[in-house]
Amino acid sequence: MPIVVTQAHIDRVGIAADLLDASPVSLQVLGRPTAINTVVIKTYIAAVMELASKQGGSLAGVDIRPSVLLKDTAIFTKPKAKSADVESDVDVLDTGIYSVPGLARKPVTHRWPSEGIYSGVTALMGATGSGKSITLNEKLRPDVLIRWGEVAEAYDELDTAVHISTLDEMLIVCIGLGALGFNVAVDSVRPLLFRLKGAASAGGIVAVFYSLLTDISNLFTQYDCSVVMVVNPMVDAEKIEYVFGQVMASTVGAILCADGNVSRTMFRTNKGRIFNGAAPLAADTHMPSMDRPTSMKALDHTSIASVAPLERGSVDTDDRNSAPRRGANFSL
């Protein structure tokens, strides 16, 4: 099924704009204060909404890569270079590691990948050949599948796939579409995992990666996003248990795969931490309804998009063919 912009997503545009316009999250890039350029993310949202308006809400066959829709995909304010950067023990692509000092706002709950889960990151992991991508696409079924750092395979041909090449692009899609209520997954964070420098833990992963996951999770919490990230440490089954334990104990929610099935879970929910699958996976339950008998309402944030009211007579009320709602008018 292609990515579809529904009434519920449109209703979230104003909320997303408020979150993006709020005080910027305090970040550290290579040890120096910086901030995210949220204008880039709002521009991306506007571009995606405009494309959806031309196709009745469906983004089937539409290229929504940030590199295609935006002139500049850099979302970090660029600090001045220092000679000390060359000797830094941390190097994440071109931007360096960043940190988010604690939560900037209260988390909200989501219904994906499990009921009542807090906004942020859920790590999907497993040993080599454990079926992580199978679990992601057949059991969790995300609305948007970000493909990053993986070799070409059948999943790249899915209508939900968005192909990116940088950390900035990954954050633009996760925050931009995640803040609108889409279930977003990243397959995978291999470029982050393999390019970090520093001492490795017993599981073979650079220790700073665990804090990086927490930082990214706190960043997504600021914008009400629930994102599943595939972690592929390329270790055997014995070591993956250690890695899972480290992630579960000190960073983010986690799902462990084995032989194409979910073997263990730990979700951070509004009822506390839930271990070992007591909270079932909830694929598609957070998917906004396309047949609500409501009209599209005009948005306050015209800088992102404005939606003309929908005439009741143009709504496919029975929605028997599962087609997107018709009659929507988007304008920028």
UniProtKB/Swiss-Prot annotation:
Binding residue positions for ATP: 126-133
The species this protein was found in: Pseudomonas phage phi6
GO molecular function: ATP binding; ribonucleoside triphosphate phosphatase activity
Compartment list: Virion
Pfam families linked to this entry: NTPase_P4
Main subcellular location of this protein, as a coarse class: virion
Basic and acidic residues composition-biased segments: 313-322
Involved in the regulation and mechanisms of transcription, replication and genome packaging: annotated span: 111-138
EC code(s) of this entry: 3.6.1.15
Signal peptide: none
Gene Ontology cellular component list: viral capsid; viral procapsid
Keyword annotations from UniProtKB, A to Z: ATP-binding, Capsid protein, Hydrolase, Nucleotide-binding, Transcription, Viral genome packaging, Viral release from host cell, Virion
Name the record gives this protein: Packaging enzyme P4
Single biological process term from Gene Ontology: viral genome packaging
Region feature Disordered, mapped onto this chain: 310-332
